[in-house]
Structure formats: C-alpha cells, structure tokens
Amino acid sequence: MANPKAKMSKSRRDKRRAQFNARTKAAVTVVCPNCGEPTLPHRACRHCGHYKGRQVTGKVVVA
C-alpha cells in the first residue's frame, strides 16, 4: 500500500480539496424583480442597487 512520505498540513490538504469544489459548482443567479438583470441571491442588484424592494445603493455603471 502507498504511504505518505511527509505529513500534509491541514492548509495544504484543504487547498487541494478546494480545487474540486471550485470547478464543479456553477454560479447561482436569480432575476432581479426591479430591473430583470441576473444577480446573486441575498445581495443587492449590481445594476439597479435594489434589495428586497428598496434602494440600498447608488446605481453602478457596469462597463
């Protein structure tokens, strides 16, 4: 059987495991009810600045 030549730290182990999850999970988006643009869930819309029906940030110009 194969044996490890040196101890692998938890940090190195977790960095290696993170690569699999980064590649397999697709970005989840929802449609903003105010402007109809796709945005991340539970966050203010990057296009119009609305969250839960309220204006929370200024309008951002996305180039």
Curated annotation (Swiss-Prot):
The keyword Cytoplasm does not apply. One of its GO terms (molecular function) is structural constituent of ribosome. Pfam families: Ribosomal_L32p (PF01783). GO terms for biological process: translation. The keyword Lipid metabolism does not apply. Residues 7-18 have a biased composition (Basic residues). Residues 1-20 are annotated as: Disordered. Belongs to the bacterial ribosomal protein bL32 family. This is Large ribosomal subunit protein bL32. It comes from Chlorobaculum parvum (strain DSM 263 / NCIMB 8327).
